[in-house]
């Protein structure tokens, strides 16, 4: 793999035998050719330096070694066979060619006659630069989607006290991760659990129930006073929801009061928070819990869904689910009850939302293969940040061209005063960002870039 000669020892026996062999190897070496333990990532680094692997594939290999779920594994394997490095290099070569045209005019304009003025040449080059900027913009957007697969999707449960948020979390993760009680305000802080949902790594957070001082607890007839600890829990719950990628809004079927009929409870605090989340463009799924009490409402499930949709019309009906954590926990799958509590359909809805979040954007740009957008999901955070920096330099170049064009409309004599040196510098800086992506070419301090990548590997890789 490294491109160097390798000697492997296949040792039989326990740890003591391995330790003895390693000790013996240390004694057999000479001072001129010492033998030492490999540093983290050293074998992979040597493979890179010997041109056996490029830097984007090195990062994909690191993702493969740390993959926990199936979707993470697929993303990392895709990265090891994708053409990200060659694509970055082709973009860099395009910028080098564009920069060369500008610098030719800078260096030889006094000795040679050029058909185009500086502003005209820059305007001609800007067509390619604008196309590249658009490609990089969508590439970077897809990289953000890929990071959701790589780092995990943040999911929060939001609702009033006692609607069954903790029971829902326990049912999703398959164990008692959160305390379940009939007492209001049992959950005071965010309880976060990592779980594999359909191959997607998800960080699921249970939060404190939302209510105001003037609101009644769902299981009590009299008003409960909120203490300072619970107030802080409610504040953290709202903050957690705003930071999450997906929010599950939990309502429940409850009796309005002692002896009164059951109906869906949608408290003011919860609805206000939901509208704030919608304004922040958050992905919301609604779970209407305790549907085992549906018969006591005199309503059909479709009527309950319609009532929620009327209160929150921005949420489509296919993201509103009627469930029963009680039935899901107490019943087993069978031919008679294939989906107890409609819980499987609810989880499928969550997974479909995850797919929508992580499917690549395909802008259908002329002259591009659709496969590049799927591959762009594999771009790491380091690559995305460099792409964003590259875009900043490209936008600077385009802004200079636009300003010169606007000035030329006002005064024709200004056209020849376009500063090609500054424009060429913007293209050089953009090309250097692309070079740092692969660790090749004029990448500035490449050693610093490589150090960041390889130090994440364990010893022996």
Regions found by a protein language model. Give the residues of each.
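Intrinsically disordered, low-complexity domain-flanking/linker segments in eukaryotic proteins
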Residues: 216-225, 258-265, 272, 306, ...
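Canonical P-loop GTPase G-domain recognition
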Residues: 131, 283-285, 292-375
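Conserved P-loop NTPase architecture
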Residues: 1-154, 373-454, 458-461
């Amino acid at each position: 793999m490294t491109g160097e000669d390798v000697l492997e020892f296949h040792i039989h026996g326990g740890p003591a035998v391995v330790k003895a062999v390693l000790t013996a190897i240390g004694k057999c070496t000479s001072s001129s050719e010492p033998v030492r333990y490999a540093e983290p990532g050293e074998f992979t680094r040597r493979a890179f330096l010997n041109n056996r692997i490029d830097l984007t594939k090195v990062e994909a290999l690191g993702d493969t070694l740390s993959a926990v779920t199936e979707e993470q594994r697929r993303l990392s394997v895709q990265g090891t066979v994708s053409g990200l490095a060659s694509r970055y290099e082709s973009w860099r070569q395009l910028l080098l060619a564009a920069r060369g045209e500008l610098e030719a005019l800078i260096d030889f304009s006094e000795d040679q006659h050029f058909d185009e003025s500086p502003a005209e040449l820059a305007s001609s080059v800007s067509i390619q630069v604008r196309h590249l900027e658009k490609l990089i913009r969508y590439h970077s957007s897809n990289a953000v989607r890929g990071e959701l697969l790589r780092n995990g999707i943040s999911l929060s449960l939001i609702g009033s006290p006692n609607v069954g948020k903790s029971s829902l979390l326990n049912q999703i993760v398959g164990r008692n991760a959160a305390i379940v009680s009939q007492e209001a305000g049992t959950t005071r802080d965010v309880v976060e659990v990592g779980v594999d949902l359909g191959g997607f790594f998800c960080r699921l957070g249970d939060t404190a129930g939302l209510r105001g001082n003037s609101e009644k607890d769902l299981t009590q007839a009299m008003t409960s006073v909120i203490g300072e600890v619970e107030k802080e829990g409610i504040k953290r719950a709202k903050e957690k929801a705003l930071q999450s990628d997906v929010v599950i809004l939990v309502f429940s079927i409850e009796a309005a009061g002692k002896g009164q009929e059951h109906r869906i409870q949608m408290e003011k605090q919860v609805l206000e928070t939901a509208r704030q989340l919608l304004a922040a463009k958050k992905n919301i799924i609604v779970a209407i819990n305790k549907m085992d009490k549906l018969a006591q409402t005199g309503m059909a499930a479709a009527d309950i869904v319609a009532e929620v949709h009327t209160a929150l019309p921005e949420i489509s009906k296919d993201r509103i689910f009627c469930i029963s954590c009680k039935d899901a926990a107490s019943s087993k799958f069978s031919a008679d009850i294939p989906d107890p509590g409609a819980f499987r359909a609810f989880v499928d809805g969550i997974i479909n939302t995850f797919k929508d979040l992580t499917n690549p954007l395909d802008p259908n740009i002329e002259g591009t293969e659709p496969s590049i957008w799927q591959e762009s999901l594999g771009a790491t955070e380091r690559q995305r940040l460099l792409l964003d920096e590259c875009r900043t330099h490209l936008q600077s170049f385009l802004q200079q061209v636009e300003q010169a064009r606007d000035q030329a409309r006002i005064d024709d004599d200004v056209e020849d005063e376009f500063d090609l040196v500054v424009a060429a510098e913007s293209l050089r800086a953009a090309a250097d960002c692309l070079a740092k992506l692969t660790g090749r070419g004029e990448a500035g301090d490449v050693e610093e870039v490589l150090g960041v990548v390889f130090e994440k590997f364990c010893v022996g890789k």
